[in-house]
Amino acid sequence: MRVIGAAQRGVYPASEFEHKQKYGLTMMVSADSGLTSYLGGVLKQLAEWLAAGNVQKLVVVIAGQDSGETLERWVFDVQTDKSIGPDQAVEKPQKEITSEIQAIIRQITASVTFLPLLEEPCTFDLLVYTDADVDVPKAWEESDPKYIASSDEVKLRSFTTKVHKVDTMVSYKADM
């Protein structure tokens, strides 16, 4: 997630990131304390909801800072195997899961080659689709889906942990 919105697409300058090893890859991780704090809170809540099987999808939206127009929409569609309880062992080896995550990260990084250049300063937003009965933190707010009219879409690789299957896709404004 941090790779998409901030570093790879230039939403934040490269100077605001540090190179760190994660999932066996060198990744750009935010050095900005405000951004790190914000993402830390979101990711903590997301992890809780994922563990409970309450997440349907995560969407990273990149929008024009001045126009507010959605330019890219990165969708991570989550299917949870509800028959596997939180205390049950997962049959899939961690090495295999890590390999699939590496493949997705590489594909996201490579997508910069076919996505249109972002011609204006941009911001990002995170949309988390959950089950209807989930308690949402008070600081969070409802949002429209921020769809893109006349978009092109590219389906990226999927990965599975045996508990979760994640399908990935990016849609982007075709006529930028």
Describe the role of every protein-language-model region:
Residues 1-37, 45, 49-176:
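Long protein-protein interaction modules used by eukaryotic assembly/scaffold proteins
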